[in-house]
Every structure is written in structure tokens, then in C-alpha cells.
Amino acid sequence: MDKKIKILTLGDHPLSASGIGTQTKYIIEGMLKTGKYSFFCLGGAMKHEKYDLVKFEEWGDDWQIQPIDGYGSQEILRSVMRGHKPDIIWFMTDPRFWGWLWHIENEIRALAPMVYYHVWDNFPAPTFNKKFYESNDFIATISKVTDKAVKAVSPSVASQYIPHVVDENIFKKYPDQEAAEFKSSGVIKEGNFVDKDGKQKFVFFWNNRNARRKQSGSVIFWFKEFLDRVGHDKASLIMHTDVKDPHGQDLEAIIASLGIMNGEVMFSTNKYPPETLAKLYNLADCTINVADAEGFGLATFESLACETPIIVTMTGGLQEQVTDGEEWFGIGLEPSSKAIIGSQEIPWIYEDRVAGKEVVDAMEAMYRMTQEEREELGKKGRNHVITNYNREEIMKKWDEVFTKLYNDLGSWENRKNYKAWEFKEIA
């Protein structure tokens, strides 16, 4: 290929710690290694110290990031389109952030195809998204639930299931000695991992945003009920989150009210590189996510790659992580209730709630397992990740998608198979 395929990405900054940023980075790096692509990224959704153009010594002009506020605007996009003339526009995250983009899709798609990497948490089928889905040339879906939803609402739009990936060379099982040293490193300052008998405590890990759907407060209350069963010195819960997130609960107030301030619940509030996060998963005996809605659930995915079993709600992308339909890699909790919630933007969607007693029972079941049983679950979990979410294979899928779109649909002077208008007969 004489000319490299130039892709413009919109979304979270590729170097940010968010799940969207992480996946964007994985995809860009995977495509750059083929030698066929160049990327210009509008990196948003974070507070920037400066707005200088970012380049990388390894990639030169083939990967440039322009920091922006929010996710951009029509004016910014028009300017970038004129200045860089991308062959493909790729964007990712919740549909509610892209109304401004789809509003001018007839203008943008006339120049280059639009690829939407989409997540949707649950059914009933979101028919209210139909106008959004049909404003794209291709939709990549991150979970099987998302894929079914898109195909149910807009079967005429080209779509394909392309799940998330993890860097299995970072998120992996570390030697026991290295994990032990990490426990005493002070990363978790309140770290008291030994019970009254001098034995190692059982450690649960929770790595999520402190937000309502993540059930952060419920997790603490349920963990306290679990401690009431097994003994308050027998286990600890590490919560990697912002305890004062304005979208969540005051978690410090909760543990104070429950009287569990002696190392039972420990907060990890700093932002860490992937290597440190991987060690946190290794430190834990089990990672838990009982959110009532979850598009994919990157934390439990990373946990499985580190051979740490999981407890999850059977919702969204979590349900395809905890089991492959035959084997289980932790404990999956079926929702005890399904409520239809919504808003003015999203009129309906299921909210999958789990019962507190079932969560506590699952915690106890994981706690009562032998170490060998948990290790077996963990090994199977990593094999599930490597086999069914193989990074190299998924990068091949992205390469195939981008190459086909470039060849079949073209861009700018060679744009094909798109009309910015349609003819309707008016009686």
C-alpha cells in the first residue's frame, strides 16, 4: 500500500487511564505496528495541563494527539477534516455524547466513512437509537449484548462484534514473592493484611468509578454483613476509586457509620499505571463487580487475565466474562429484579439488581473455597481471556475492518457508496 490509511479518532485521550482511553491506545498501537496506518487523535474527556500537540518518537507523524476539552465540536471537527483529510473517522463511547456529530453526518460522511465503536448495556432493544445507528457506515460492538441490540434495531447497518482486549503481558500472574513484596510496599497505606492469628486475610478488590450504577455503597454494606459472618479480622476490601466522586456516595462516611475503620475497607485513590494495577489484582483473592448495568467491565476482565477469579452480576458484558457457556471463572449472580428505568435521552433500559444476601453468600462461597480451587478458577479465567479475547486476533479484525472500509467506501475524491440525500415520493 503506497498511501497510509489516515484515521481520525474522537473520544477519551488515548493516554488516559479510562477504559475508553486504554482501548483506543491498544487499537492505535496494534494498527501502527502493521505499517499501514497513521492516526490523528482528538483526545478529550480529561483535564489537560497543556494543549500542545503530542507526538511519539517511535511513531513520528504517524501518531499525533491534539488535547481538547470535552469530546470536541462541529467547528473543531470541520477544521480537522480540512486540515488533515482523514480517510476514516473512528469514535467511541456512549451515544449521548455524539449527537452533535451525527447531526452533521451527511456533511462528514460525504468525505469519509464513520466507524462507531459502540457499547449498550441492556435490552429492551433501544429503538430510539435507530437514527444514531443509521448515521454510521460501520458499528463495532464491544459485547454480545450490544451486538444483539444493534442488529435488532438497525439490521441494515454493517456491524460486527469486536470485544475489548487486555495487555496480557502486563495483566498476568506475578510470582508469589513479588505479590508479597507489593503488599508491604505502602501502595495501600492502611494495608493490614494479617488477622489476629497471624494468617493472611482474604482480600476482595473492587475497581470501579464511585457512581450509582456501580453499587459502591451497597458493596460496603454487604461486605460488612459478610464480615459479621466470618469475623471482622478475616478479610479486607480494597476499593480503587474516588471516595468523594460527586456522582457517587461518601464512602468514608459509610465505613465510619458501620464502624469498619480498622483496615476492613481500604481505599486506593491514586491513579496508577497498568503495571501497578496488575499487582493490585494479584494481591487480591477475588475481584467483585455487582453493578446493575455494565457495558463490558474492564476491571474484572483484567482480573481474569491476572488469574484472580471474579464475582459479577449477570448483566451486559460481565456475563460473557464469568463463563464461556460451559466453564465458570468465578461466580455469576442472576439479577433478583429487573426494573425499567430511563431519562429524557434514554426512555427505557433494564436495570439489573442483585439481592444483597446473594452477594454476601457469593463472598462467603469464594472465601470458603480452598486456595487450590480459586487458583484453578483463575487459571481457567486467564485461558478464557487469551483464547476468546486474543489481542492479536482482535487487532487482525480491526485491520480487516479498516482496510475493507478504505477499499470499498473510499474517502474524499474517491468516496463511494454513500449518498447525503434520499429521494422520497410525496403523495
Question: Which residues make up each language-model segment?
Answer:
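Short N-terminal targeting/anchoring amphipathic segment
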Residues: 78-98, 113-115
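Aromatic "clamp/platform" in nucleotide-sugar-dependent glycosyltransferases that forms part
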Residues: 292
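Carbohydrate-associated surface elements
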Residues: 145, 165
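N-terminal subdomain of nucleotide-sugar transferases
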Residues: 1-55, 84, 424-427
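A short, well-ordered alpha-helix in the C-terminal region of glycosyltransferases
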Residues: 358, 365, 373-387
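Nucleotide-activated donor-binding/catalytic signature segment of Leloir-type glycosyltransferases, i.e.
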Residues: 64, 248-271, 275
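Conserved donor-binding/catalytic core segment of Leloir-type glycosyltransferases
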Residues: 8-9, 190-214, 220-223, 237-238
